[in-house]
Amino acid sequence: MCARWKNAADTGSQSSQGKVPKRGDESRQRRRTLPEALLYPDGPAKDRTRDKENGKMSQKLRVGILGATGMVGQRFISLLENHPWFEVVTVAASPRSAGKTYEEAVGGRWKMDTPMPEAVKKIVVMNVNEVEKVASTVDFVFSAVDMSKDEIKAIEEEYAKTETPVVSNNSAHRWTPDVPMVVPEINPEHFDVIKYQQKRLGTTRGFIAVKPNCSIQSYAPVLTAWKEFEPYEVVATTYQAISGAGKTFKDWPEMEHNIIPYIGGEEEKSEKEPLRLWGKIEDGVIVPATEPVITCQCLRVPVLNGHTAAVFVKFRKKPTKEQLIEALRNFKGLPQELELPSAPKHFIQYLEEDNRPQVSEDVNYENGMGVSIGRLREDKVYDYKFVGLSHNTVRGAAGGAVLCAETLKAKGYITKK
């Protein structure tokens, strides 16, 4: 995944017929076509700096990763390599890792399928608890810390109060009423609650924004695409990969040839978090929607990456199958309109084959940022049923958080200090 931004910072000196990877071409084109006010929300003079080596204009924001040595932290490191807008300059972790280089701190626990980026290997790990020290080095942070929920809530607020925006992968603040929980294609307007949060925190720049649970990525976007048909009752069963627990088969050999029919806390998250995505801002807080009613079972299955969901839906305005497929294929959100660097060109793909989506074939659709849907058909008890698949550590974790940060930058909430 780290190679996705290869050459993204190059200028257009090479033609489109040169040997520049296609993704790099798209990233550069996106940077050129974004409105100046979105690329540089504080104005060109403040937000653009000159690359001393080649004289080119660049405007990378300095990023810190909290919890950088864990699986999600590693995914952040991997995804942000050569990112056109963001540069990892600080990595922070527990006191036992502090003082070591990132390479030493991770040791043999690098779990990505691509090599550790050279740019981060020699960065000295900072103590995540030294909030002021860490915050002084960055423009904003991604949070993937492994602590108790109360500890996470406290430390993320500490960072926000240093006027450092926090984009969190953690669940601790997902139900804090004035903290936006966002899938940028679904509810980017919820970022507007930040101004109320800042009043509570006493900040002008610092805030917390979070992304939702990985389990809902395979069906919440689909139900959003079908909103006009008024889905009101949903039954879902999720089949969740072991990387969602921060594990590989090497770490968790007992998961081979095994299924565990329980994942602590996942069913409640899977039932309630979509309703918050579909909620509205009222009196400075986010009020969740009340429909559709969702009931869910979550199973851990012997797959490394990729959460699959089998979903049944009832509609108040029952559509045809063709209408549902058309809605999926036409669905896009703000990231697609702005052509943000991490945004999939086509958020949802519908697959006609009876044996799709498959993890082995489809989990990396749109670099892991897209959602794959198949087996849509009428049901004898519900109106329709389908199968969804998403990448749990990309779209469902670090990648989703990176897209949130890109959206926040485009909307002017994240700027250089």
PLM-predicted stretches and their roles:
Residues 2-51:
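Sequence/structural signature of beta-propeller domains
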Residues 5, 40, 147, 315-317, ...:
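Non-catalytic surface loops within mature trypsin-like serine protease
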Residues 10-13, 26-31, 203-207, 288-293:
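Glycine-rich, flexible loop segments associated with nucleotide phosphate handling
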Residues 15-17, 184-195, 275-283:
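Short regulatory "switch" loops immediately downstream of catalytic or recognition motifs
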Residues 32, 60-62, 385:
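Residues that mark the start of a beta-strand
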Residues 55-261, 292-293, 365, 371-372, ...:
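N-terminal Rossmann-like NAD(P) cofactor-binding subdomain of oxidoreductases
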Residues 243-417:
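Charged docking surfaces used in two-component/phosphorelay signaling
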